[in-house]
């Protein structure tokens, strides 16, 4: 009888099983580019559409936004682009945590500095209310902060 009472007490005190995290997805590339452009305006840079930068003899990185008259910009890299670039895009160093990833081009693009932002770093879920874990606003603010930090460095170091 005592065993049944203890078992009933333990069952009543047990918590619900842990639930799986909400499925997430990255910011849409068009929205990400809008945020990048706004960050350029915030830092008093003139954003213009970017162009491809040679990373390897047969592979180019599409830069989404560059500063007018300068050789620095931002590339929002999607899964498709990562797949196409393969090993031409240097791997991120896990020891660096969430440090910004900068790449330079080859040849004529050798002095170009590009901030590579991976879509997988800007995830959100579609849930609302208390079920919401990763908001769109949080992902957008993180992207804006990362671009702003890059631009502050570009200005401080007087990049071409």
Residues of each region from the PLM?
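Bacterial N-terminal signal peptides that target proteins for export
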Residues: 1-2
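C-terminal motif of bacterial Sec signal peptides marking the signal peptidase cleavage site
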Residues: 9-12
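Acidic-basic catalytic patches of nuclease active cores, encompassing PD-(D/E)XK
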Residues: 14-52
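Non-catalytic C-terminal interaction segments of nucleic acid-processing enzymes
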Residues: 20, 24, 37-38, 68, ...
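Acidic helix-start/capping segments at beta-turn-to-alpha-helix junctions
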Residues: 55-63, 117-123
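Alpha-helical scaffolding within the catalytic cores
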Residues: 58-64, 97-102
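Active-site beta-strand-loop-beta-strand hairpin of nuclease catalytic cores
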Residues: 63-76
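Catalytic cores of nucleic-acid endonucleases
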Residues: 78-142
């Amino acid at each position: 009888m005592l065993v049944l009472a203890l078992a009933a007490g333990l069952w009543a005190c047990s918590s619900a099983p842990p639930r799986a995290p909400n499925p997430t997805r990255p910011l849409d590339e068009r929205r990400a580019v809008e945020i990048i452009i706004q960050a350029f305006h915030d830092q008093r840079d003139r954003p213009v559409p970017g162009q491809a930068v040679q990373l390897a003899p047969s592979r180019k990185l599409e830069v989404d936004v560059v500063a007018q008259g300068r050789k620095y910009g931002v590339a929002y890299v999607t899964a498709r682009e990562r797949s196409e670039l393969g090993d031409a895009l240097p791997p991120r160093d896990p020891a660096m945590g969430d440090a910004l990833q900068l790449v330079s081009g080859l040849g004529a693009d050798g002095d170009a500095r590009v901030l590579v932002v991976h879509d997988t770093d800007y995830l959100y879920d579609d849930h609302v209310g208390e079920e919401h874990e990763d908001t769109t606003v949080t992902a957008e603010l993180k992207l804006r902060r990362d671009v702003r930090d890059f631009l502050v460095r570009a200005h401080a170091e007087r990049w071409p």
